[in-house]
Design a protein with these regions (language model features):
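PLP-dependent amino-acid enzyme catalytic core
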Residues: 1-336
């Protein structure tokens, strides 16, 4: 939002799951300045919001109507492959840093553990590997919504399960869009992938063939951690290393501990702990205030870590966007 605000020739609409973000995340979006910006909460979870947006992208009538106005839709999340391109870079950066520090011999493999729900960030690591980076295993770290863990272990993707709201909300996803891309690269068959996706849409489940699963497991491993595991990891990392991590990174740390080999492993940290200050405080054994902003101040006082100014000042900004849509209304909003 901030990157595209008030850019000529670009209009921005953001759809996010109502009650599926922290207070800080919500205010980052709802207070965003810019004449070309519109933000909508969607009643439901991330899957409801993303599925609604993907339906709009696939709607030929919407595309035709917008074409008349000289408008073409694009996406800033990983619906758009361009979202993955900058993520590829830090796999190379991390490897080069390790090599320069002597932690790994040039050309020797390094494993990466990635907290993910939509499979985008970890897919960027797969692309880095395909480009020649010596990536060993890509370890997919899930929270209690562990549909990816089950798939990577068994080859069966079954979204017909309870949806859990966790302390790592950006991973609260049951339909992982980017997995479809991996299936295409591994199977080499658009017909197979289309069949699996149609089966998922119709039944909520699909199973890949043994050859496809074997190829996936050559590059990927998986594990999951629940909220209690993550909280324990936040405290352990701070007490042991004085490293303050967020709830998503904590999931990856816990999974990394269970999936270690002799190869060096990099844990990808994907969010600031100050976006989830109440949960981080609670994990550290401190009673958290009701407000995220009071919790942010308490987290700074208790750890010495400084919250980004852009987050500290959010409660002083005007809330510009308050509309809550049903998923079926996303199409109408896109045509406004």
């Amino acid at each position: 939002l901030a990157g595209y605000a008030d850019l000529d020739g670009i209009e921005i609409e953001v759809f996010y799951p109502n009650d599926g973000t922290s207070e800080i995340q919500h205010l980052q979006m709802a207070t965003q300045k810019g004449e070309n910006v519109q933000v909508y909460a969607v009643q439901g979870n991330f899957d409801d919001a993303q599925t609604g947006v993907k339906k709009v992208f696939a709607d030929a009538d919407v595309a035709a109507e917008l074409e008349k106005r000289g408008i073409r839709l694009s996406s800033a999340n990983s619906i758009n492959w361009g979202r993955l391109v900058p993520q590829i870079v830090y796999y190379f950066y991390a490897y080069f840093r390790l090599a320069e520090q002597g932690a790994v011999e040039w050309g020797k493999p390094v494993d990466f553990c990635v907290p993910t729900g939509n499979f985008g960030d970890i897919l960027a690591g797969y692309y880095a590997k395909q480009m020649g980076l010596p990536v060993g295993r890509l370890v997919c770290a899930s929270n209690k919504n562990n549909v990816l863990t089950d798939f990577l272990r068994t080859g069966t993707y079954d979204a017909r399960r309870t949806f859990y709201k966790t302390t790592s909300p950006s991973m609260d996803i049951l339909i992982s869009s980017n997995l479809e891309r991996l299936l295409y690269h591994v199977s080499g068959s658009s017909e197979k992938v289309a069949g699996w996706m149609q089966e998922l849409s119709a039944t909520g489940k699909y199973t890949v063939d043994a050859e496809t699963l074997a190829k996936i497991q050559q590059s990927f491993a998986a594990g999951y951690a629940d909220d209690a595991d993550g909280a324990a990891e936040i405290k352990a990392r701070f007490d042991g290393d004085h490293y303050l991590c967020d709830t998503h990174t904590a999931v990856a740390f816990r999974v990394a501990e269970t999936r270690r080999t002799d190869a060096p492993m990099v844990v990808l940290s994907t969010a600031s702990p100050f976006k989830f200050p109440r949960d981080v405080l609670t994990a550290l054994g401190v009673e958290a205030p009701a407000s995220d902003f009071a919790a942010m101040a308490a987290l700074t006082a208790g750890t010495g870590a400084e919250a980004p100014a852009s987050l500290r000042e959010l409660d002083k900004l005007e809330v510009r966007f308050k509309t809550v849509l049903q998923p079926a209304d996303i199409r109408t909003a896109a045509l406004r």
